[in-house]
């Protein structure tokens, strides 16, 4: 084992005061030669995603001690997207990714920790931890809190998205208030992150593919015993990684990120994966850009039938073989790089050796490569005069991903949702929600409430919604987000007027407004930059330093 980084605070006469502090929290003489391992715990009672993390932290802490390390627990924050959704509070969600990254980096580096074991559940916990891990490049592993089991109502599987869609169904007369309350009471049965292939489960899969969490761990249910056993094993593996000097940047290669993108396409993952993978890769110094997603999408099919647009939830994927089964299918098809390694030092080819070549015949969650749900990936990168830097369209479940229609323009998510619930949106409309980007929001809110209301009203196949904001992993339909440049910095989305014809064409990877360059230039000359919405606090700071979404909306370029 190499010289421990923590020797800076534990060794030598001059560090006697430092050691006295450590003795006060339980260190003995022999402990000063052990690796100090940070346990970054995102436990919170504010969300079911994180309410079960403490038991995992305790299991990991015990395992670290048994394996010869010294665990040092500290907390980091979380934001509950499900609670914040549709409110001003959602502006803090993406910001929390940076707060989580900064807090983990700060705690670990300030105390010269030798390694970190990060534990998280809700959406931004995963990319926040990965950004910190890439910055520090000390031996690291991530423990996902686990997915929630599906809610049940009259034999139907429910997720949190069922509740959002029920709002639209109620306002369009498809259900009554009694049914709405039944869905509300039954869609979230306990601890765990939202149950479909939404953002949390998508990003936990990304971490597993990158090799920084254990195989199969990203799809385990939060309340199952195997999740606790996995936490213990993760801690043991981390101590081994310290001895082997396996570091995150050894694993976070360009090929590893390409593997992650391939798997996200195959499972039908969240649009947020684009934003977060770009941010993590940027921190790791890896040249991954938005065009890489389109390149990989063209060759990787969607082979998993998962919610929000599909039939099954993440526990079903786990029971069908999980992410390793998906990876084995892609590996055999030459669609991922088998030489990439994981935290145990094993190559993908090695640790998938005992995974069957084909998915089990008694399930319908994972398909073979020769009979996919969709022949190409579902996350299309669209460009055009409305998104010169690019945008992200989620086209799974959309029969005809092409629409030209008049713009219905809204300057905020709230105004858009109000119009939808008042039945002001009709088939053929292109709904535009702008000034919701990283700078303009600020914070790039997710448009789950509007998209769910559109789907709930039966317009999911007939209306497009485009925005410089984001979408929840639970959104589906013809939706285009991450439009860059955003409205607040003078992107062309700021120049659209009510009724302008907009074309969204995911087949041709095109998003444009039917206006000449001359007309756009004329409007740009008359455009007035909006005043900042916040003058103090974290949203004010964030809006001044955040990058464009096409670079991952990072704050440390």
UniProtKB/Swiss-Prot annotation:
What reaction is this protein's catalytic activity? (2R)-2,3-dihydroxy-3-methylbutanoate = 3-methyl-2-oxobutanoate + H2O; (2R,3R)-2,3-dihydroxy-3-methylpentanoate = (S)-3-methyl-2-oxopentanoate + H2O
InterPro entries, per database record: DHAD_IlvD/Edd, Dihydro-acid_dehy_C, DihydroxyA_deHydtase, DiOHA_6PGluconate_deHydtase_CS, ILV_EDD_C, ILV_EDD_N, IlvD/EDD_N
Pathway linked to the protein = Amino-acid biosynthesis; L-isoleucine biosynthesis; L-isoleucine from 2-oxobutanoate: step 3/4; Amino-acid biosynthesis; L-valine biosynthesis; L-valine from pyruvate: step 3/4
Q: Which domain of life is it from?
A: Bacteria
Q: Name one GO biological process term.
A: isoleucine biosynthetic process
Which Gene Ontology terms cover its molecular function? 2 iron, 2 sulfur cluster binding; dihydroxy-acid dehydratase activity; magnesium ion binding
Q: How many cofactor units bind, and how?
A: Binds 1 [2Fe-2S] cluster per subunit. This cluster acts as a Lewis acid cofactor.
Family to which the UniProt record says this protein belongs: Belongs to the IlvD/Edd family.
Its assembly, as annotated, is: Homodimer.
What does the function comment of this entry state? Functions in the biosynthesis of branched-chain amino acids. Catalyzes the dehydration of (2R,3R)-2,3-dihydroxy-3-methylpentanoate (2,3-dihydroxy-3-methylvalerate) into 2-oxo-3-methylpentanoate (2-oxo-3-methylvalerate) and of (2R)-2,3-dihydroxy-3-methylbutanoate (2,3-dihydroxyisovalerate) into 2-oxo-3-methylbutanoate (2-oxoisovalerate), the penultimate precursor to L-isoleucine and L-valine, respectively.
**Protein name per UniProt:** Dihydroxy-acid dehydratase
Question: What is the species of this protein?
Answer: Prochlorococcus marinus (strain MIT 9215)
